[in-house]
Structures are given as structure tokens and as C-alpha cells.
Amino acid sequence: VSLYYSDLEPRFYASIAYSGRVWECLTATEDANRDLSVFFYKDSENGQDLMNRELYHWTGIGVCKYVHPDDALTVGGSLKHKIEPTIRYADVLLWYAEALNEIEDGATYSFPSYNNQGVITVSRNTSQMSEAFRQVRFRAGLPDLSQQVYNDRNSFRRALKRERQIELFLESARY
């Protein structure tokens, strides 16, 4: 495998099918059809469309985000049903961090709680922004952003946009 694909963010390996990637294919009935290294280029049979041998990954990359390790398209193999969530908790956390970031400095808003048992007060609070944003990064095995990024509204807005693009890749999300 090319060193080009080494030492990248963990979500890359979970989402992108690159040339040389190993496909586990755990439901394949023959050992030879499991743990396959697949290379995408014109003269390789890997990655070609079975209906049209001229169709293949021209760029050398594809998508593996929704591929389960058990999935195998070989004789005796099977595909796992995937549950596609309507809304992800990671998206809710990113919305929350974004909403806090967009509150003007010094502004405070109060509104009744969902059960009318109290009042919720919100303001641009970088520790709350970090708490929400950090959960998304930690789940992916990534470190938190620096406090400087949280303190600067525009820097955090850029970081948030990039995080949303990577975390919600191929999930019909808009940025």
C-alpha cells in the first residue's frame, strides 16, 4: 500500500476505499475470499463493475463508509442490513456547539425548560462548546482543539465546518 495513505485521520480509513485497502469479507465461504487487498486501476479486476468491465474507480478511491466487515459479494457471501439513522448524536453535538459559537459576546438568553420546571440560560460559553465538540472528536480517536480556536469565533466556525464535512461524510448533510 502506498505511503500516501499512511498516518491519516482514523475517519479516513473508516470512510474511504483506497487502492490497497484490505476488505475483510468475513461471510465469504472460502478463505481465499477473505481479507482481500484490493487495488483500483484499469488493468486490475478489482473495483470493476461486474456488468461493465470498463467501469472502475478512475481516481483509485471509492467509498467504504457503509460496508460492514461481514459483507462479501463472493459465492456464499452475504451483505449485512445497515440501519441508517435519521439524526445522529454527533450532529446534535455539532449543532449545539455551533449555536453557542454564534451567540454574540456578552449576550445571554433565557427561556423556560422543556417541562416548565425552571429556566435555561445560554451564552457563548467556550467550555460548553468544547464539551460538545470534544465528544465528537474523542469518539473518532482525535484530540480536542486548542483553547485559542474556541476563543476565536471565526476559527471555531472553520473548524466546525471541517468537522461536520468529515464526520457526516455521505450522510446527506449540508455544510
Q: Regions from the language model: what does each represent?
A:
Residues 1-175:
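Acidic/polar-rich alpha-helix caps and helix-coil junctions
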